[in-house]
Structure formats: structure tokens, C-alpha cells
Amino acid sequence: MIEPLLCGIVLGLVPITLLGLFVAAWNQYRRGSAIPDWE
């Protein structure tokens, strides 16, 4: 049985981690695809 505290930490960290990875990937994609188009 998973402890409530551990479950709460996981449920709290997972969305933040996914959001951080998504933002980082989006920034890299936008920087890698948009700048050559402007040049």
C-alpha cells in the first residue's frame, strides 16, 4: 500500500516535471525552427 505522503509527493512532482519537460522542448523547438526562418 502506497503511503499518502509519498502518493501526494508523486502526484505533485509528476505534473511539474512533465510541464518543465514540455516547456523546455517547446522552447528548443521554437528556437531551432523559428530562427533559421527569420534568417
Curated annotation (Swiss-Prot):
InterPro entries: Cyt_6/f_cplx_su5, Cyt_6/f_cplx_su5_sf. HAMAP family: Cytb6_f_PetG. Its main location: membrane. The 4 large subunits of the cytochrome b6-f complex are cytochrome b6, subunit IV (17 kDa polypeptide, PetD), cytochrome f and the Rieske protein, while the 4 small subunits are PetG, PetL, PetM and PetN. The complex functions as a dimer. The chain crosses the membrane at residues 5-25. Component of the cytochrome b6-f complex, which mediates electron transfer between photosystem II (PSII) and photosystem I (PSI), cyclic electron flow around PSI, and state transitions. PetG is required for either the stability or assembly of the cytochrome b6-f complex. One of its GO terms (cellular component) is cytochrome b6f complex. Belongs to the PetG family. GO terms for biological process: cytochrome complex assembly; photosynthesis. It is a single-pass membrane protein. This is Cytochrome b6-f complex subunit 5. GO terms for molecular function: electron transporter, transferring electrons within cytochrome b6/f complex of photosystem II activity. It is found in: Cellular thylakoid membrane. It comes from the Bacteria. Keywords: Electron transport, Membrane, Photosynthesis, Thylakoid, Transmembrane, Transmembrane helix, Transport. Pfam families: PetG.
